[in-house]
Structure formats: C-alpha cells, structure tokens
Amino acid sequence: MVVTSNADRICTGITSSNSPHVVKTATQGEVNVTGVIPLTTTPTKSHFANLKGTKTRGKLCPKCLNCTDLDVALGRPKCMGTIPSAKASILHEVKPVTSGCFPIMHDRTKIRQLPNLLRGYENIRLSTHNVINAEAAPGGPYIVGTSGSCPNVTNGNGFFATMAWAVPKNNNNKTATNPLTVEVPFICTEGEDQITVWGFHSDDETQMVKLYGDSKPQKFTSSANGVTTHYVSQIGGFPKQAEDGGLPQSGRIVVDYMVQKSGKTGTITYQRGILLPQKVWCASGRSKVIKGSLPLIGEADCLHEKYGGLNKSKPYYTGEHAKAIGNCPIWVKTPLKLANGTKYRPPAKLLKE
C-alpha cells in the first residue's frame, strides 16, 4: 500500500483525548487510562423481598390473622395453621412480641426465642398426636384446664395446643406432692428435631389451695439433650391482668421449651400447676435467617440487613457492611474499577524541520 501526503512528515501513534479515568495499580500507583468499567455500586435502602429462586418466610403462619409468631409457636386457639417450608426467613421480630391468651411471664424464660428457633428450620410442622396423656400423668388423675381468656374457634374456653393444664380431678389428689417425673418420648420422624413446649401455672395462695391443695412455691425441672433447667414458682403478688379483652386473671403461667434430638427422650420433674407437653413441633432442614421487615414486596437477588432487597448489578458494593443472603455482591471498602482501555498518552505532536 502506498500512502502519499503533502505534509512534511507522517507520524504514527495513539490518538487520544483527555482521559477522566484514573485507576490505582499495584506497581505504578494512579494511572490515567482511556476507559474503565465500574465494578462497584452503593445500594440505597429498599423494602425486603422474596429471595429469587427460593421460598422466603415472613410470618410463621401467613394465614393466621391477628396472631403474633409467638401465638403460633405456642398453639394459641385461633392461631393454628400450616407453616410453609422455606430456605430463607426474615427475622422481623428481633425481640418477639408477647403472646395473648393467658397472662405469661415472658421474661422468666427463653420463650420469646421460640419463634426465632422455629424460623431457623426449613420444614416445621405441629404433631397431630399428643406426646403425653395428660389426664393419666403421675400425680393424677387430672382434668385439662381451660380459660375464658383463651377462646377457641367456637368461642368456648380453650388453652394452648402445645400444653395441657393439669388440674387435679378431685379432692383426693388436691394435695401437696413430692416432685413427680414424666418422660417425654420422641414422636417426630427420624432425622427431625422435636421442640417440646411445657410450663407451669401459679396464683395467689387462695387460688393455689382451691386448684391444687397446696399454697407453697412449687419446683419444676426439664432435661433434654444435655440441657437441664430449674424453676420455682412465685405465689401471689400479681396484679389482675386481662389479655385481648379476656377475663382478668390473678394467676400467671411460665412457659419454656426443650429441644429433643432424633430418638432422644426428655424428662420433666414437677409439682402442682404443671402445664404438660401436648402437641410438639417437628422440624428439619435449615433456613437461612436474616433480620428484616415485612411485608415482602417482589423478588430480589439478595437480602441485606441494612439495604433490604438488592438486585446484583455489579459484583461488589460499598457502603454499610452487614449480613446478607442470596446471590449478593461482595462488600469492599473502596470502589473498584476494571481498566478496559490502554494507558492514556497525550496526543502526538507533529515535528517541524
């Protein structure tokens, strides 16, 4: 190829304009380049969403209206329903709210943690059978107590499905008793964890004598999976309290739970006022849990505790560093850029003779 020109001299080189792109390199420090691809984004806060490609759990029982997660976990009447399986869960109650029904001394035990424990499982179901025959338990015979403060689906007196309020049936066994022990068998399917809820009731001296024949503080112990917990009941001193428009109650209940691993038996040692386990939670698999808020709107690649639902537009992000689950960008302290051009060189100058 022949090139002709009237110019005094032909110069070859890189044609370039002023470059606004600066990248930091490992060997040469800051370098101007002709082009870059941004690799980071700084998210803005958004609502939480369903995680793409998997089921995301918000409330434990979405169809249980006007129920807290603790209501569902305890089996409160009118709060019974199916808990959908989920591989990801939103911890929307960092400190779960109280349950209604009968007044509970929530802060004496770890019972507030029960909804969050259940949330950490992929599959959760309530057993169809009772784990203990409460009427025939040691220290009986018993009748199963109910309360007008805990109405069932027909608006009759009810109680939590996970527990049976064991009240001595007749005057012959309404007496003080030495500690009694009942075994809690494993009734879930092999490979599942069994979460067994139990508790005890106490009242003022007059009501304790009327119900149980003993007004002294009662002792209770649970043991499962190497964990043993002891309680002593408080007698009296409670102001009357009503839950959700129910009858004012002078008594209180203390509720706890124990986790039984597959095939393992638990034990409960008790005196008067025991709330014996009934239906138990059978749980398996693991659900990734992240703190967030409801409702879940739409879908997102990633759920981030600080930013909510994120769609991954870049491989990295800057901003607040926090727990995230899903297909998430990686947190970096400073923005990253990928140079997709060449090192910037000033335009060549024509040489004059």
Curated annotation (Swiss-Prot):
Keywords carried by this UniProt record: Disulfide bond, Fusion of virus membrane with host endosomal membrane, Fusion of virus membrane with host membrane, Glycoprotein, Hemagglutinin, Host cell membrane, Host membrane, Host-virus interaction, Lipoprotein, Membrane, Palmitate, Signal, Transmembrane, Viral attachment to host cell, Viral envelope protein, Viral penetration into host cytoplasm, Virion, Virus entry into host cell
SUPFAM superfamilies per record: Viral protein domain
InterPro entries for the chain: Capsid_hemagglutn, Hemagglutn_HA1_a/b_dom_sf, Hemagglutn_influenz_A/B
Signal peptide range in chain numbering: 1-7
Any one Gene Ontology cellular component term annotated for this protein: host cell plasma membrane
Membrane-crossing residue ranges in chain numbering: none
Protein name per Swiss-Prot or TrEMBL: Hemagglutinin
Gene name tied to this protein: HA
